[in-house]
Amino acid sequence: MGTIESYLTNSYNYIIFNFKKLCIGGLMSAIVGAMSGVTTAFIDLFMERANYDIMHIIMSFLIYFGIIFIIGLIVSAIIGGYNVRIMKTTVEGLNVAPDWNNITDLLYRGILYIVGLVLLNIIFYFIPAILFVFGIFSLYISKIIGAFLIIISILIFIISVISLWLYSKLAEVNYSVKGFYGFFEFKEIFKMIGIRYIILVIIIAIINFIISLIVVLPLNIIDIFISYSALANSILTIIYISIKGISYALSTFVDFYLGVFSIRAVALYYKDRKGIT
């Protein structure tokens, strides 16, 4: 049985050893991130110009955002499919990152991956959402009953958030091994959640937060200072848009590697709990 330290160390070494192969996913994420960042910068700047036709700007950016959304969805599906391969090969005991071949298979597995996660969100949040809606309507009948239902729904929502956070990570690995229905083996997956696992995912979350903050914060600070003067100076406008694009690109690039680090560590834990050698 491995230790938390061994899972984290192995995941770090996995990224270092396979950095070049994984770079494909990082670059795909960065390209979509840069496009989103540049678009966001344009909106920030030009929505403040009173002499522009606001509706024309909104329609133009909606079309552009639609294109970015479709591209982003395709890239997310491909990366999701690749993450499934990483989890599966990790459980199988391989230390070499899988190839980026058979894009159709990556898309297929990635789409199922996204659908599975969406369904899990619906399942976990259905009850608190229904209770909250009933609570809102009950306020018109009895404020006490309405308030009670709303409070209960919020408490259940908090429990659902924590439960889904812990459950979904193991469910993803289970899907990579058993197929789509692996998402919904609730009894089996909840049995795998123990103190060691909870500590592991908390440490992973802290590591991801700190690294993301270190990477993005300096550019965001520069971004804030430049944004106030960007409209008045064409050079500053270009710098502002560039920084926004770089910030988003760098953030999504790093997020990809952090994602690989996370799923690798959880997959190693899953492998140990299943007793797979």
Curated annotation (Swiss-Prot):
It is found in: Cell membrane. Its main location: membrane. The chain crosses the membrane at residues 23-43, 61-81, 117-137, 144-164, 197-217, 221-241, 243-263. GO terms for cellular component: plasma membrane. InterPro entries: DUF4013. It is a multi-pass membrane protein. Keywords: Cell membrane, Membrane, Transmembrane, Transmembrane helix. To M.jannaschii MJ1189. This is Uncharacterized protein MJ0233. It comes from Methanocaldococcus jannaschii (strain ATCC 43067 / DSM 2661 / JAL-1 / JCM 10045 / NBRC 100440) (Methanococcus jannaschii).
